[in-house]
C-alpha cells in the first residue's frame, strides 16, 4: 500500500498490508479498515481478513476464512468485502476449485470479521466480484463475464446478500474473455459508474472502458 496526505501530490513508500486483493480494503461503520484477501508470496497463503485501526497506517491479521469441505484454499483468489445494512460483513471469493469452478463464492461474518462462515456458491458464474452497498441499502455486485456475452454484469440483493437477482448486463460487446475486474461507484445523483479493463480484437494493448448507468429496479 502507498498513502498520500496531500491529495495525491506526493506518496509514501510502499508498505505491506498482510493480504493482497485487487479491489482493496473497505471502511466499516465503526471506522476500521477491513482488507479481505490472500497472503500471497507465503507458503501458507492463508485466505482471510486483516484490519487497520489507524486509517491504514498499520495492519493486523484478524481472521482466517475456512475452506469448504474438499476445497483447496489456495484456489480461492481475489476477495472483496462489503458491510451490509444488517451489520454483517460479506466477502466474495473467486473460486478455482473443481467444484463450482469459475463461480463466485460468498462467506459472511456476524461479529465484525472475527469469524466467518464457510464459503458457499451463490449461483453466479463470473469473477472477480466487486461489492458495493448502495445508498438505498441494497447490495450490488459487479463482475467480469468471460464467456459469451463477453463483458461485465451486475446483480442486486435487497436482503443483505442472502439472495441475488438475475444478471444485469453492463457491457456485452467484448472481443473475448480477456476483460473484467470492474469497479463501481455510486455518484451523487444516484447513477453508477463502472470501470474495467478490456483487450481489443485488433490491438496488442488493453484499454480502460467505463459505463455510466442507472438502475431501473
Question: What does each model-found stretch correspond to?
Answer:
Residues 1-217:
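Asp-box/BNR beta-propeller blade signature and adjacent active/binding-site loops
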Amino acid at each position: 500500500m502507498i498513502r498520500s496526505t496531500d491529495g495525491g501530490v506526493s506518496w509514501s513508500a510502499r508498505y505491506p498490508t498482510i493480504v493482497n486483493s485487487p479491489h482493496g480494503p473497505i471502511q466499516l461503520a465503526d471506522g476500521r479498515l477491513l482488507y479481505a484477501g490472500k497472503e500471497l508470496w507465503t507458503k501458507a497463503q492463508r485466505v482471510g481478513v486483516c484490519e487497520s485501526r489507524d486509517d491504514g497506517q498499520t495492519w493486523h491479521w484478524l481472521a482466517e476464512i475456512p475452506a469448504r469441505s474438499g476445497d483447496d484454499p489456495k484456489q480461492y483468489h481475489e476477495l472483496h468485502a462489503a458491510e451490509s445494512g444488517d451489520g454483517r460483513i460479506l466477502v466474495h471469493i473467486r473460486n478455482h476449485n473443481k467444484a463450482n469452478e469459475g463461480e463466485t463464492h460468498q462467506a459472511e461474518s456476524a461479529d465484525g470479521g472475527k469469524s466467518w462462515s464457510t464459503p458457499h456458491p451463490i449461483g453466479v458464474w463470473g469473477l472477480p466480484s466487486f461489492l458495493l452497498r448502495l445508498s438505498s441499502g441494497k447490495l450490488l455486485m459487479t463482475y467480469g463475464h468471460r464467456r459469451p456475452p463477453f463483458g461485465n454484469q451486475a446483480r442486486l440483493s435487497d436482503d443483505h446478500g442472502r439472495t441475488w437477482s438475475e444478471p444485469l448486463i453492463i457491457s456485452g460487446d467484448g472481443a473475448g474473455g480477456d476483460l473484467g475486474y470492474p469497479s463501481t461507484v455510486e455518484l451523487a445523483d444516484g447513477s453508477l459508474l463502472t470501470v474495467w479493463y478490456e483487450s481489443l480484437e485488433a490491438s496488442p494493448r488493453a484499454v480502460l472502458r467505463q459505463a455510466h448507468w442507472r438502475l431501473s429496479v
